[in-house]
A protein has these predicted regions:
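Short, surface-exposed connector motifs at secondary-structure boundaries
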Residues: 41, 140-146, 165-170, 193
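Short, Lys/Arg-enriched N-terminal segments with co-localized hydrophobic residues
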Residues: 5-13
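AMP-dependent adenylate-forming
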Residues: 30-31, 35-37, 95-121
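Structural core segment of the AMP-binding/adenylate-forming
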Residues: 162-202
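N-terminal amphipathic, basic-rich helices that act as targeting or association modules
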Residues: 12-82
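A short N-terminal helical cap/helix-turn-helix that marks the beginning
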Residues: 48-50, 58-71, 88-109
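Conserved AMP-binding/adenylate-forming core of the ANL superfamily
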Residues: 44-48, 108-162, 179-184
Length: 202
């Protein structure tokens, strides 16, 4: 297998500054992907991805753990890259992938400016997301709704963001240390249907 760094050095006509040890290369996610895809070198993978982008992106979907249905079509090509449509028939919610784990391992680690510490395991995060989901549904928040939050970057705001995305709504937030005018300017752009606010800054 030829590493990506070696390939870069060859292309630009110079020696690489650093080359990883073979064991590190073999243990990389890229090497694992190449093995599953059945290609021998990075150069082969790159060439195949250009010659057959639909093949490449199907391989990527199948190997990266996305939870959802990819659909039959992988790529609708446009005249320019920005016009291309990937997986037009896919059905998924990114939260299903982000919350694929539900065990007692660490999910979030929070340390506040005043020394407050909070660690949240995956099962606790699931429970907190569920609480927010229920509150959102009771407030008739769904696909296309807009939810805003004036909250610090604690595990709670991540749970709220995940819950909002899980019901198909749009999420935006500002920190409590925003001034009133700045918060109004941000939120007025999206005209939220529901606003969450914390009573303190962590």
């Amino acid at each position: 297998m030829v590493s990506g760094r070696q390939g870069v050095g060859i292309v630009f006509g110079m020696e690489p500054i650093w080359t990883p040890a073979p064991a590190r290369v073999e243990g990389s996610l890229l090497a694992q992907f190449m093995s599953v895809a059945g290609v021998e070198s990075y150069a082969d993978l790159h060439a195949r991805s250009i010659a057959d982008p639909a093949w490449f992106w199907r391989q990527f979907w199948d190997s990266c753990g996305v939870v959802g249905q990819a659909g039959d079509r992988v790529l609708i090509e446009g005249e320019r890259m920005r016009e291309a449509v990937f997986f037009p028939d896919a059905r998924l919610n990114v939260v299903d992938t982000l919350l694929a784990r539900n065990d007692d391992s660490l999910a979030l680690m929070f340390r506040g400016e005043a020394g407050h510490a909070l660690d949240m395991i995956w099962s606790e995060l699931h429970a907190r997301v569920s609480q927010y989901q229920q509150a959102l549904r009771e407030a008739a928040v769904g696909v296309g709704s807009r939810v805003a939050a004036m909250m610090a970057n604690t595990p709670d705001i991540y749970a709220l963001m995940l819950a909002t995305a899980s019901v198909g709504a749009v999420f935006t937030s500002v920190s409590p240390d925003f001034g009133a005018a700045a918060a109004v300017d941000r939120f007025s752009q999206v005209e939220p249907d529901l606003l969450f606010a914390s009573d303190r800054y962590c």
